[in-house]
Amino acid sequence: MKVKPSVKKICDKCKVIRRHGRVMVICQNLRHKQRQG
């Protein structure tokens, strides 16, 4: 899980979602997991 000020899709399988008011990226590739904060 990377915590970044701005999250972006890295590949085609990345999805940008909102959980509990936080913007997150989830992906099949676990290296692409990101959270804004």
Curated annotation (Swiss-Prot):
Protein name in the entry: Large ribosomal subunit protein bL36
**Example GO biological process:** translation
Q: Which family does it belong to?
A: Belongs to the bacterial ribosomal protein bL36 family.
Q: Does the keyword rRNA-binding apply?
A: no
Recorded GO CC terms: cytoplasm; ribonucleoprotein complex; ribosome
Name the encoding gene, please: rpmJ
Q: What are the alphabetically sorted keywords of the record?
A: Ribonucleoprotein, Ribosomal protein
The molecular function GO annotations come to: structural constituent of ribosome
Concerning InterPro entries, the annotation shows: Ribosomal_bL36, Ribosomal_bL36_sp
Q: Does the keyword Ribosomal protein apply?
A: yes
Species of origin: Acidothermus cellulolyticus (strain ATCC 43068 / DSM 8971 / 11B)
One Pfam family in the UniProt entry:
Ribosomal_L36
